[in-house]
Amino acid sequence: MSEIQARSDAGSEGLKTAAAFTRADRACAFGPSFFMGHLGRFVRDRCPDPKENLPVVQICLADGEALDVCHIVGVSPRWVMLAVSDAASHGDGMTIELVPYDLIQRVCIRTRRGEGASIGFSQTRAPEIIDAETLLRAAILPDHESAH
């Protein structure tokens, strides 16, 4: 496979992925863009340091369960992977939950007591910018093309 063909295939996969994320955002109020954008400071591979003074985030599910979010491990077009407090451990235990977006009913964000916490935006971390052409193609890519 030539380098040009490899780049074309990678671009095609990126377009398909962008289309899948766009469909997920359209279908659910709290889709991938919500978690990557508004809660972007929680996307990481570890629990936040208390000195960061991040807000408290609780995800309320359709089945009545409420998840206290420590951090966001990752997102896919169908679910978000969350590290949440494990109530059964009666301590500092964590559980990894894969939650389908359509199960999420409500998100509660509360500032911590004391100094003001920042919710959603960070001036120190630049967001990833997706060019308009890629977004437009992802938005109009027919479903049957994105399945390949």
Regions found by a protein language model. Give the residues of each.
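Short, compositionally biased strand/turn segments
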Residues: 43-46, 50-51, 73-91
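Amphipathic, interaction-prone secondary-structure segments
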Residues: 56-78, 83
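Short glycine-rich, low-complexity segments
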Residues: 1-62, 113-148
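Short amphipathic beta-strand/extended segments with alternating polar/hydrophobic composition
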Residues: 68-71, 96-101
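Short aromatic-glycine motifs in intrinsically disordered, low-complexity regions
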Residues: 53-60, 86-97
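Surface loops and adjacent helix of pleckstrin homology
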Residues: 71-72, 85, 109-112
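Eukaryotic short linear interaction motifs
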Residues: 67, 77, 89-91, 106-107, ...
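Phosphoinositide-dependent membrane-docking surfaces
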Residues: 98-110
